[in-house]
Amino acid sequence: MSNPIDYSKGIYDAKKLGTPRLLILGAQHMFAMFGATVLVPLLTGLSVSTTLLCAGLGTLLFHIICKGKVPAFLGSSFAYLGGFAIVSNDGANPENLPYACAAVAFSGLLYVLVSGLISVFGIRRIMRFFPPVVTGPIIISIGLILAPSAITNCQSNWLLAFVALATVIVCNIWGKGMVKILPILIGVLVSYAVALVTGAVDFAAIGEASWIGFPIHKEAMGLFAIDGSEKFISALFTIMPIAIATMMEHVGDIAAISATVGHNYINDPGLNRTLMGDGLATAMAGLLGGPANTTYGENTGVLALTKIYDPLVIRIAAVFACILSFCPKFEAIINTIPSGIIGGISFVLYGMISAIGVRNVVENQVDFTNSRNLIIAAVILVCALGFNSVGGITFGIGGVSVTLSGLAIAALAGILLNAILPGNDYEFDSNPGTGEGTSLRV
């Protein structure tokens, strides 16, 4: 007679649970990431199927590079929404989206560069250039820049927006277990049910969609948008600086996973490997026409809830995501979600992005009685919001017209001021002690 499995101390080898349980656990992780992952293409105009494929393949690539040690799922990053909005002119110019994807690919390569620098110079020396006084205000700016688009979507149907918003709030505040981990998915489902009752859903496209199809579309790929044009160069300057914030998000998420599992992944397999894995996954996603990838805090919540820490379960979820991406009819169903629901979800989402930036500053005890820190934060916020309101700065380089967005200017100004102003006493802690990451998601 076999001994009963003790879940209290965590399961590090899930194979002992048997194949049926493994598949169920993998499906659970897929549902945890699902709401947030498909919301990004709905907000940006990218393909849901491509996004799911990139999330699945990106997660598997991440696990290969990290030697299969880190139980992390890579899904769509909300941090780049502001960049996509600027490049596509809030969706008015969807033909520019491939240029944004190409820039996302180069952002991923920036991760790889920083990974190499960490390997050569050490993590503490590199992280001094990206302290919370710089990354916090950048994250705050991302949410504030996106705020008008949330209101625009809400205006199409305030009832659906309110139901979606209220459901997310209730799940976050009073939810228990998986309900608390899946607020976006539940918010969409509840408000979608209301939309069905009120006749706000158009099913015409579902009948026309096939059951099986290839999720990659050549015309949407970032690979073929790398052409040296003005649109491509401007997209690079708009989107690549966002990687500064998302790299710090990555560090926070890896610290959260480390604290949850009880293993220091920042040291083993090392932050250089996790950054490289995330970066290459993001580069691949951009080239294929998907959004940037990032380690998902939702799945860390599932780890804490189930106490099953085997990365194999995450890889099963990644395979499920890949399989689902080959069903165009499923994408058609997702695309029937009314914009009012998207507005309600993004209403709280965009606000929480800014709030998480504030949390980043508070948790790291940034001293705003120090004039140095006040100046850096003030310049970042005004550059981001001010220049965004006037369309950024346009200048010529070698006959090519380049536009720097407000976010790009803010990031560059923050890094420069942090480097030249005296008093940079930030010391990066490579020993995570809490389960709180710097996740840019609800």
Where do the model's predicted regions map?
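Intrinsically disordered, low-complexity non-transmembrane regions of multi-pass membrane transporters
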Residues: 1-24, 203-223, 259-266, 274, ...
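Membrane-embedded helical hairpins/re-entrant loop segments and their flanking transmembrane helices
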Residues: 10-20, 42-63, 240-311, 434-436
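Interfacial segments of multi-pass membrane proteins
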Residues: 84-91, 172, 299-314, 320-325
